[in-house]
Amino acid sequence: AHPYVDLINAAMEKTHVQKLGFEDAYMTVADYRHYSEKLHCQLVPATELLISLRQSKDEEEIQRMIAAQRIAEGALDQIVKEIKPGVTEKEIAARLQYLMLAGGAENMSFDPIVASGPNGSMPHAVPTDRKIQDGDFVTMDFGCIYQGYCSDMTRTVAVGHVTEEMEKVYNVVLQAQLAGIAAAKAGATGHDVDAAARKVIEDAGYGPYFGHSFGHSVGVEIHESPN
């Protein structure tokens, strides 16, 4: 028998509960059949309910997410000292993973993204063997899991000399980020936050090149609601 079956059945009998909710979006057909046969209760799809419950985090959950973010920040502090011409995107990605695991992470929230030079135009680029060059922007998107909760951060660093246009774009993105943060408050929607950041970029003339949403929520999964 599955190790969880006896525990679940005992809990259901003790509480006299007859229905058990499950995340149907994440359960295989084989698992569903297995649990339907072995559990002494009715399985009821409850993905939407669980998603809504996870929208609000309690203090313990928040502290775990903060701890996960601190680990990622520690990795960033070190990796920026190591990014230089000749190092490949893959090497930076591997180093980020090592630093986060060494810093106390259980695992990665997702495979780190490291995109340099022209690869930075792809929001979900996969690290390649491309070597960092002088004058590159290097964008890193990464995070880790601590006690079951995810962190996620994106940072862009400049290597050596950058052009005036690159510096301008960097600062436009920074101001957009700050505008989004200022708009993120109780009662605001994800659309409100995105719109505040997007307006800064559009007003600067870069609207057509903003091909991604401003952000997303995190928790036990790397993408959670509200988005």
Q: Where are the predicted features?
A:
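Active-site neighborhoods and metal-handling regions in enzymes and metal-associated proteins
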Residues: 1-227
